Design a protein with these regions (language model features):
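DNA polymerase sliding clamps and clamp-related checkpoint/processivity subunits
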Residues: 1-27, 32-161, 169-266
Length: 266
C-alpha cells in the first residue's frame, strides 16, 4: 500500500499479535461494536447482549508506530468478521488499519511480514449500528488488587469447571475466591506478596458473586500483560483491567450475579 495515499486515517503498529489476542477475546463478548477513532486514539465502550458485561477499551495514539487521524470517525465493526481477518497474524507481523477517502464503507487492514516480504490487504465492510453512547460516572472503589494474570486465569478456569459463580472477597490483605458445585467446593486464598498487592480506601470487607462463564471469557486477555488490576466495591460490578501490550488498556466490567445463583451450584 502507498503510505502517502489519500486516507482519512492510517494507523500502524508492529504489535500485531496483541491486536490478534484482543480481537479474539472481544469477539466472545461483543458480536458487534462501534470503534471510535480520533486524534487521541481508538476507543470501544459497549455492553454485551445480556447487558451484564461492559467493555471499555482505550488504545492511545502516541503508542502506535504511526498514527494519522485528524478527525473523529465511528466505525461499526462485526467483531467475529474482524477476527477472521487478523487471526493469521504472527508475532513478527505489522498491522496497518486505514480508510480511504474514496470509500468510507470499508476499513482497510494490511498485514505486513518483513521477513517474507509479504503484504496482505483486506477491506472489511463496515456496518451501521444504532447504539446509544454509554456514560460511566466516576467511582471510588473500596479495594484495588494487582496480581499475576496467569494466576487469575488458572483459578477462574479451574472454578469454571466446578460451578456457575464465584464469590470474590477482599478482606484485610487477602483475596479470597470461593466456588460451590454439585460435587465439590473450592476456596483459594491469595495473600499480599508473591506478586499480589492490595490498595484499600477503607477497612471494610468487600464481597460479591459473579458468573464464572463471563470471567472465563475475560481471561482470554491473559497473554496481553503479566499483571492485572481488579477493582472491587460492594454491590457494584467487578472490573478487571488488562494492559494491551503497552498500547493502552482494556477494562472489563461484570455485574454481580443474580442472587438465586449466588452459591455457584450447577
Amino acid at each position: 500500500m502507498d503510505p502517502n495515499g489519500d486516507y482519512l486515517f492510517r494507523i500502524r503498529t508492529v504489535k500485531a499479535a496483541p491486536i490478534r489476542t484482543l480481537s479474539e477475546a472481544l469477539k466472545e463478548i461483543l458480536t458487534e461494536a462501534n470503534i471510535e477513532i480520533d486524534q487521541n486514539g481508538l476507543k470501544i465502550m459497549a455492553m454485551d447482549g445480556t447487558h451484564t458485561v461492559l467493555v471499555h477499551l482505550r488504545l492511545h495514539a502516541d503508542r502506535f508506530d504511526e498514527y494519522k487521524c485528524p478527525q473523529k470517525y465511528i466505525l461499526g465493526i462485526n467483531m467475529i468478521n474482524l477476527f477472521k481477518l487478523v487471526k493469521t497474524m504472527s508475532n513478527n507481523d505489522s498491522l496497518v488499519m486505514f480508510m480511504e477517502k474514496r470509500d468510507t464503507t470499508k476499513m482497510g487492514i494490511v498485514i505486513l511480514n518483513g521477513e517474507k516480504q509479504m503484504e496482505t490487504t483486506f477491506n472489511l465492510n463496515l456496518i451501521e449500528l444504532d447504539i446509544n453512547p454509554i456514560e460511566i460516572p466516576p467511582v471510588q472503589f473500596s479495594a484495588i488488587i494487582t496480581m499475576p494474570s496467569l494466576d487469575f486465569q488458572k483459578i477462574i478456569r479451574d472454578m469454571g469447571t466446578l460451578g456457575e459463580t464465584v464469590e470474590i472477597t477482599s478482606a484485610s490483605n487477602q483475596l479470597i475466591l470461593k466456588c460451590r458445585g454439585d460435587f465439590a467446593e473450592q476456596e483459594t486464598v491469595f495473600s499480599v506478596g508473591q506478586g499480589m498487592t492490595v490498595s484499600k480506601s477503607h477497612s471494610e470487607i468487600v464481597q460479591g458473586n459473579f458468573l464464572l462463564k463471563h470471567l472465563v471469557l475475560f481471561t482470554k486477555c491473559t497473554s496481553l500483560c503479566s499483571d492485572i488490576s481488579i477493582y472491587l466495591k460492594n454491590d457494584y460490578p467487578i472490573i478487571i483491567e488488562y494492559s494491551v501490550a503497552g498500547l493502552g488498556e482494556i477494562k472489563l466490567a461484570l455485574a454481580p450475579a443474580p442472587s438465586k445463583q449466588s452459591h455457584g451450584g450447577k
